[in-house]
Regions:
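Hydrophobic positions on the alpha1 helix immediately C-terminal to the Walker A/P-loop
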Residues: 485
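P-loop NTPase motor domains
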Residues: 84, 91-109, 117, 121, ...
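Post-Walker A helix-loop "phosphate-sensing" segment adjacent to the P-loop in P-loop NTPases
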Residues: 492-502
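Hydrophobic anchor at the beta1->P-loop junction of P-loop NTPases
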Residues: 474
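Conserved lysine of the Walker
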Residues: 482
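Conserved P-loop NTPase
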Residues: 763-814
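A short helix-turn-beta junction within AAA+ P-loop NTPase domains corresponding to the substrate/partner-engaging
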Residues: 518-522, 735-748
């Protein structure tokens, strides 16, 4: 794909990259410039001041938009694509993924050559570790931060996050100019990305810098220095793009080569069997070495392909006739053919039928394997491992003697090919190198730890705030680890963010953790001295934001509260709802007009008094409030007397009776609304955790109010999380069912049989995937983050201060 003379003269610096000209403004720091300068000095020293290493890299020009001019008339683009959950999908879904992947391969006609590159590359461990390290702060929690950082680092290094299996699809065309090539390549790129998107695979175009970065890591194994590059710096220093990506040195031997401080080799691979297992590529990439599988593909015109196959069939038929003649002359039965000829005829006839009637095309392909090692001995051991893997999959590996330079550069994602050995293969044959196993979820920057990917062993790390709907559900049977998972997320967020955290705790489970974090524990009970006022509003939000919305929300809440208090089969009448709304409007109008302060906040008794003044229509509601105003349950007829400014607040409602517990949980939710309202002005996130969430979903009024939170919280900077063992309660009404639709984060631990069926239907989870929440151990299950679904395992170290703060197991607390 594209040609050049070996050892061609190095291209002029000004033509090696096309840059949008302007005032140079380097993006590299002084320290990075020092590192780059040292690297260039090393390259000059290793090569005697000549550019021999740069000349090995076979392209003429890299454009900022990602178009690469490989040779005078050949241009290419590279798309990086990501993983899909192939391994844990059911057979039908695997077939769908396979079929759609075939569609992507069939996008390319005989004018477009393409290259599939699957490469294990090292990620900087120091950089990775830095992402999970929590900086110390001037507070009392640095010992916990240190312990948590050490735990995360340990889990990170035990996994394979230090390596990334990158997947590139490079395609190229012949063209007389960059402008004409770009237009066609960008059109092809759009079709390719759309093709991947059709089966849920993310794909993105690599721009010029990203392509250079991919080349840098392919050519610099085991180097700790990161890729450093800047277009303006290149112009200022009079450098070439190849100066930024080439290895310090290259020395080619008969069957291997030395590259910088490492050793490498490229081998060819021939397929012996008619069919291959779909895990062949997975077997190679799971070897945890710096390893690359490369497939160059040259599509045939469909008419030429049919002619080619028919000619092959004619030749084999002639072989058959010749064999029959020999058998007849020797006195044998002419119908008895050698098995190889019989099988060959069957294969060609099947291929001809597939080309005529199925979604199959024919291609010339060449397959190569590239590996790096730190020593020759290690490289030899690696080659033996590769041979065994090839044999296991009915393939044979062979060396490219005296062609290591040509084959090395052919493994780079450029669309350039000097690999001599090639064979014919149809669409399904190429697609059987299935590049999909399991999706990964590891976000850089501020993110929360959620366990280890059961399939890959990699850490799961994500930031819910980045989701369109950060609302979440944590679901599981008793003993599955719900409370522990919630506390782990709370602890992580407390240590790594500035978010406010509020917990509704119906079972009194969160006290040890909240106390250790110096949080505010609010005990709501008939005999408690701590009070929260259900008539509270956020005064600043009213005065400076949206007063009508504040009062409308408060009215909606108080109507729901009165409906629970009044009870009965039919709840409040339309007239009663209207009169409550009227009274609420009047109460807060008077409050606002008379220098509003916290110590003048209205009480439930004010609402009762206003209702009495409305006469007969409001009498039933006013009388129902009596017990909560002057009776035994008047704990909510007091002004708030607790510090609500603490960053972490836990409402302990364990001692409330069942009916009062619903009232308490609803009042807590309204208090959270007030906090979210106040924080919205500060652009601060408020996380709200509701344990025993099913208690709120059983009553129409509290269920409706909860559904409203799930619909509106995100706009105000709220992140609610419902925790429950009763999944069926989430289907109690269409309104409540919408909670599922408005939750882009679902953390599923072990599930009861009936709940598994509900989750499978609502979240479109396959039977194969549901195995991970069937009789699973504590801390094991499935996580859904937007469209990503992964099995996870969280074996939290028990010999830590953190574990003792979070566990609820009686054996651990004894």
């Amino acid at each position: 794909m594209g040609f050049r003379k070996r050892n061609a003269k190095r291209s002029d610096n000004r033509s090696s990259a096309k840059v949008i000209m302007g005032k140079p403004a380097s993006q590299l720091s002084k320290e990075e410039k020092k590192i780059l300068s040292a690297r260039m000095a090393e390259i000059r020293s290793e090569n005697g001041g000549k550019n021999t290493v740069q000349n090995t890299i076979p392209f003429l020009c890299m454009y900022q938009d990602g178009v690469c001019q490989v040779s005078e008339n050949f241009f290419s683009l590279t798309v990086q694509f990501y993983d899909a959950n192939y391994s844990i999908s059911e057979f039908d879904e695997q077939n769908n993924i396979f079929s759609k992947y075939c569609d992507v391969i069939n996008l390319f006609d005989n004018t477009i050559k393409f290259q599939l590159t699957f490469e294990n590359q090292n990620r900087s461990k120091a950089k990775l570790v830095k992402t999970v390290q929590i900086p110390e702060q001037d507070d009392d929690f640095n010992s916990i931060r240190k312990e948590y950082s050490e735990m995360l680092t340990d889990k990170l290094l035990k996994g394979s996050n230090g390596q990334s299996a990158r997947k590139f699809l490079t395609f190229g065309i012949e063209s007389t100019s960059y402008k004409a090539a770009r237009a066609k390549l960008m059109s092809i790129k759009n079709d390719v990305i759309k093709g991947f998107k059709a089966f849920g695979v993310e794909a993105e175009l690599l721009d010029g810098r990203q392509r250079l970065e991919a080349l840098y890591y392919a050519l610099n194994p085991y180097r700790n220095s990161p890729f450093l590059f800047d277009w303006d710096e290149m112009l200022r220093a009079g450098m070439d793009t190849k100066d930024f990506i080439c290895p310090p040195s290259l020395k080619f031997n008969k069957a291997d080569f030395e590259i910088g401080n490492a050793y490498g080799a490229v081998w060819g691979m021939n397929i012996l069997a008619g069919e291959l297992p779909d895990e062949i590529l997975k077997d190679f990439l799971e070897m945890q070495n710096l390893f690359c599988v490369n497939i160059h593909v040259d599509p045939l015109d469909q008419i030429d392909a049919l002619k080619f196959v028919k000619k092959k069939l004619t030749n084999v038929e002639q072989m058959k006739i010749d064999e029959q003649k020999k058998a007849s002359q020797s006195g044998y039965d002419p119908d008895i053919l050698p098995p190889a000829i019989k099988m060959y005829i069957e294969d060609i006839e099947k291929l001809l039928g597939d080309l005529n009637s199925k979604n199959e095309r024919l291609f010339h392909i060449s397959i190569s394997l590239r590996a790096y090692a730190k020593s020759k001995k290690e490289l030899k051991l690696l080659s033996e491992m590769l041979k065994r893997t090839c044999q296991k999959n009915n393939c044979i590996m062979f060396p490219y003697d005296y062609r290591q330079e040509q084959t090395l550069v052919s493994t780079l994602p450029l669309g350039y090919n000097e690999i001599p050995v090639r064979r014919e293969m149809h669409t399904s044959g190429i697609a059987i190198f299935v590049p999909f196993t399991t999706k990964e979820l590891f976000q850089d920057g501020q993110a929360t730890y959620y366990g280890i990917n059961t399939l890959s062993g990699n850490m799961i790390r994500a930031n819910r705030s980045r989701l369109k709907n950060p609302n979440g559900l944590i679901l599981g049977t008793p003993g599955a680890g719900k409370s522990f998972s919630v506390k782990r997320e709370i602890l992580d967020c407390f240590l790594t963010t500035v978010d406010d955290i509020i917990i509704c705790d119906p079972e009194g489970e969160y006290f040890p953790l909240v106390s250790a974090l110096h949080g505010q524990l609010i005990r709501i009970a008939s005999n408690s001295e701590q009070h929260i006022n259900p008539m509270d509003i956020a005064i600043d939000d009213y005065m400076f934001s949206n007063p009508m919305e504040v009062i409308a929300n408060k009215s909606d809440f108080l109507i729901s509260l009165c409906e629970i208090i009044v009870g009965g089969r039919y709840g409040l009448s339309a007239e009663e709802r209207s009169v409550i709304d009227k009274c609420v409007q009047r109460i807060y109008k008077h409050f606002i007009e008379n220098e509003p302060t916290e110590d003048k906040m209205p009480l439930l008794s004010d609402l009762q008094r206003e209702l009495h003044e409305e006469g007969e229509v409001a009498l039933r509601v006013a009388n129902s409030l009596e017990m909560f105003v002057n009776g035994s349950q008047n704990l909510f007829n007091h002004r708030t007397n607790i510090d609500m400014s603490n960053r972490i607040i836990c409402f302990d409602i364990k001692e409330l009776g069942n009916q009062l517990k619903k009232v308490g949980m609803l009042i807590v939710q309204d208090t959270v609304w007030n906090r979210v309202s106040a924080n919205r002005e500060k652009k601060k996130i408020t996380r709200y955790y509701i344990d025993e969430f099913h208690l709120l979903l059983k009553e129409e009024q509290t269920a409706k109010y909860s559904a409203e939170i799930w619909k509106r919280f995100r706009k105000w900077g709220g992140v609610p999380t419902g925790i429950t063992q009763n999944v069926k309660d989430l289907l109690s009404s269409q309104e409540v069912e919408n909670i599922f639709d408005n939750s882009d984060f679902v953390y599923m631990l072990n599930q009861a049989a009936g709940d598994r069926d509900i989750l499978a239907e609502k979240l479109h989870i396959s039977k194969e995937q549901m195995k991970y929440v069937t009789n699973s151990g504590p801390g094991e299950g499935l996580i859904r983050y937007d469209k990503v679904l992964l099995p996870f395992t969280d074996k939290f170290p028990q010999d830590t201060q953190m574990y003792r703060l979070m566990t609820t197991r009686p054996a651990d607390l004894a």
